């Protein structure tokens, strides 16, 4: 089932309210929505990078991925199509870019899906409860 960005933005309020430095990659047409949803007192801790998934580095491999799906079919999950795979893999390019640019002079980096609460309200609650534990035990 194909969903556009507005579907995921419906579930972004909790994530965008977290009191953390955030670098947010989004399709250009959603940039203003991100700024509207991110509380104003956190704007100084926010960098939005409007970029289309089509402009991410991994997209150059689309044809190769499509060919791999033909040669090695995998029907377990109907999301197993090139565009979904590219979207998922784009996070690694995005995270690498943030680490290299380091706009907030950070020592720790992580990825969180903007719609984490969509996958279960407890996800965001547990994230907030355990962030210090995660930093202390799983980060350098």
What residue ranges belong to the model's regions?
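Short coil/turn segments at secondary-structure boundaries
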Residues: 36-38, 123-124
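Active-site-proximal specificity loops/subdomain of glycosyltransferases
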Residues: 40-103
């Amino acid at each position: 089932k194909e969903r556009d960005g507005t579907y995921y933005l419906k579930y972004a309020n909790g994530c965008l309210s977290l009191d953390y430095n955030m670098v947010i990659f989004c399709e250009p047409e959603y940039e203003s929505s991100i700024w509207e949803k991110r509380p104003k007192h956190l704007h100084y801790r926010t960098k939005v990078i409007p970029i289309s998934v089509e402009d991410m580095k991994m997209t150059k491999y689309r044809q190769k991925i499509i060919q791999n799906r033909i040669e090695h079919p995998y029907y377990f999950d109907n999301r197993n199509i090139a565009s979904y795979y590219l979207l998922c893999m784009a996070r690694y390019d995005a995270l690498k870019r943030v680490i290299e640019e380091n706009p907030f002079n950070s020592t720790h980096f992580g990825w969180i899906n903007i719609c984490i609460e969509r996958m279960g309200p407890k996800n965001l609650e547990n994230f907030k409860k355990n962030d210090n534990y995660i930093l202390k035990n799983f980060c350098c």
